[in-house]
């Protein structure tokens, strides 16, 4: 045998004959061979594979020595390949779990899940980079991360189910129940994050499994048992559960994917100061129903309280978040924040922290204006350029025909629309949106604040109204009024704003804090002194001008 040869090194083979048979390891003259089966021979080939691994002792994961050898042979320098291989083995461990005692299944799962964390962190770093990856790379990274989190979560839940059912070896893993439940909750957090990255519908069964992990730990009186989740990460089941509930309840559907990631990392850094209780005492922010699990909901005094409800308060997190904001306001990014090596701008982190602090404030924010049901069609234009084409600036860009949406409900400050996913190309949190209701001659401006997907695959879009009317205006640098440097912006007509400020929409990165502008509006000229950058999107900047 060749020096250094690992007889258990494998290549992934997925036999598709209505099911996945799993992974096949084969040794041939001291080399590793990838065996592929033609489609017409898949069923016969499936029988051959089952025969090969029919006995537990024949399976490469059946003994810890061979399982560890496989793990040691996974390439450490290639994060994509490493995670794919670990993911495949974790899937095999679940699919063929009946071949193993549950304590052996858990013994193998632990080091494989630990080994996956390094490539997972690397891929998260690349996926949530300050500069978005290419579409190809985004899809590749998302698929691998989502696949691993899914397989890991399902395998941990399979161990839980077999333990709960009293499978052989169950008694041997009783002491590891806190770690099992915490890692299961960690994998669920990852699945939720990847769903948020695509504004995808969350599988309702995920909430039931979250309830199962928490309930098992609670029944074993180990919610507060200190544990090492992974190397360098200490937590408890209660902390993992509370962090997930606070993060998801505060950010789901109203932050961009990158902001959701930053928010999850901030909550992870806030520590173990969340409190979980069985009764509502006015301090609980979110409630989770263990009997009929659904996404975390805002806790209210008037809600029906029953024994299966768990309330999560965030007094400690709120104070630590306030302390963090003081540093961020000074331009200081604390070293304790773990963004997996990504370098985010302080202002980027501060914006997310500020929104989280607002969401954790008691009493919770209430709707400022009443919302009423209505069915009205309106034309929409997504993005600064398309809105500019439809403004009255007097320029013709050959605007294409506008998309038409139907409003479901409306208020003085915004509206909600439900559209098929296929008609929502380019729509995301913080997208700038032009709108023109039927029968109205001018266009207004809004920004997407909430996105969620329903069971039918439709996208629910919540839009905050910035202005009922936009006016295209030419803008010149007041210090250098050369007409060759003219840029076009959009003036937001805000009828009820008596602040004396003018609000403009401009191209991204057009705001300069020390540059005054000359604006022509109607037959008048105005000197605009920069006041503040209100918000910046992918293709536009909001600017408040005195």
For each predicted feature, which ranges?
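Extended, domain-scale alpha-helical bundle/helix-rich regions
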Residues: 202-374
